[in-house]
Amino acid sequence: MSQTLHKTKGIVLRTVKYGETSVIVTIYTELFGLQSYMVNGVRTSAKKGGSKANLFQPAAILDMVVYHNELKQLNRIKEFRWEYLYEHILSDVRKNAVALFMVELLTKCLKQPEPNPDLFHFTADAFIHLDKSSDMVMANFPLFFALHLPVFFGFRAPNPLKGAFENSDNLYLDLLEGVFSYTQPRHPHFIEGKQALVTAELLNVMQPEELEDIKLNHDFRRQLLFAYETYYALHIQDFGTMKTLPVLREILG
């Protein structure tokens, strides 16, 4: 099967140097899902266009013309440019830490190359919202993303009715089954009390701007992030541990 040219958007997940001037880039594309591309000549001197390598930083959203052959594991990019030019994510240490957490979480969930345009648009929109977010929204953003991403992988906890849980007394979220109840699960994989109540509140957040109203302290966010990592490990095969999580826990004070 010969290669054909296609125009697609993509989110950069990983970039690895190759040879003297090239990179191999893992990109989640709108048209083809998870793909790897060889990009030549982007690491030469700045005078010769070396700055092009900056376009392939993790979380970058690109507009591309790509060669595609479904039988090849490594294709090539003919043209590329930023689809959205970030104002803060690539330069602000805290927003960059959140973005890298989101990139790693998505990468760990993607096991097959199949396209999912809804997942692509959800993720791209999330990065753009993060770039524009206030400090409070940014601090809660990893929790929001971690709870809403699972809808695309079949294990998201259902939205509880607003006000369904008036207090946190004896409230549990079963991380294995993904359900809330007032009965303690018969296994150790659950969160309870305020953690379960706040999780229910976060699940009802439909627009990131609503995160402004959820006031949490640094330690509580860290506890929830740890619990959500366990949640993913229970549902995603070979999930392992998040390398970006320790950095994120320290930065989001």
Predicted regions mapped to residue ranges:
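Non-catalytic alpha-helical scaffolds and adjoining flexible linkers that form interface surfaces
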Residues: M1-G253
